[in-house]
Design a protein with these regions (language model features):
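Start-of-domain marker
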Residues: 13-62, 70
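Flexible, solvent-exposed loop segments that connect beta-strands
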Residues: 48-62, 90-112, 143-162
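Membrane-embedded beta-strand positions of outer-membrane beta-barrel proteins
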Residues: 17-19, 33, 45, 67, ...
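Bacterial Sec-dependent N-terminal signal peptides
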Residues: 1-15, 173, 177
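Transmembrane beta-strands of outer-membrane beta-barrel pores
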Residues: 21-25, 47-53, 71-73, 86-92, ...
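Repeated loop/turn-to-beta-strand initiation elements of outer-membrane beta-barrel proteins
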Residues: 41-43, 77, 127-131
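Outer-membrane beta-barrel "beta-signal"
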Residues: 72, 163-178
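Residues that define the transmembrane beta-barrel architecture of outer-membrane proteins
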Residues: 13-15, 25-27, 59-65, 78, ...
């Protein structure tokens, strides 16, 4: 009971919803929710989905989830925070030159998962609205089938790739519910 009371405020939680406008700008709708349990700790989970095929030769289909635990330096939803987050991505990319060694001449169908640390800052705008800036760095493990593009019947092969670097970037509009 003592350990539980250390992390949870008996007076109630504060809840916020948000959207990351950087992902909105690349046509990936997203929504996040964050619950603060006391003055310094919160948990956040965001989901992202892009089901678009841009043309017969370009596709950026994917969905992603990102849960995160955050420690707020001053107080919840105000100022600096540090976080630890996990990430899972399921994707089907085609005809695009992407990071991680993926070439435009191929298409890729697979998933990635990993863990990361993050830093961010929430800027107070009004009692209900904030703007959040965040970046995360860490590790992602990719597993995918690689196809000749346009996609042939059989994959060229199954591949794995390890990535260390930027894993999260965000400028989010935050609405505080309670």
């Amino acid at each position: 009971v003592f350990l539980l009371s250390t992390f949870m405020d008996i007076q109630g939680q504060v809840v916020a919803v948000k959207t990351n406008v950087l992902y909105d700008a690349i046509t990936t709708p997203n929504v996040g929710a964050e619950v603060a349990f006391n003055k310094h700790w919160s948990v956040e989970a965001s989901g992202y989905y892009n089901g678009w095929t841009f043309s017969s030769d370009k596709s950026f289909k994917h969905w992603m989830i990102q849960p995160e635990a955050r420690y707020w330096i001053h107080e919840r939803f105000n100022g600096h925070f540090f976080g630890v987050h996990a990430q899972y991505i399921d994707y089907d990319f085609a005809g695009l030159k992407l990071l991680y060694g993926m070439e435009k001449k191929n298409s890729y169908n697979g998933n990635a998962y990993g863990g990361c640390i993050s830093y961010g800052y929430q800027l107070y705008v009004s009692p209900r609205w904030n703007v959040e800036f965040t970046a995360g760095f860490g590790y992602l493990h990719f597993e995918y089938d690689k196809y000749a593009f346009p996609r042939g019947d059989a994959p060229i092969g199954k591949f794995r790739n390890e990535y260390w670097g930027l894993t999260k970037a965000g400028i989010s509009i935050v609405y505080i519910i309670k």
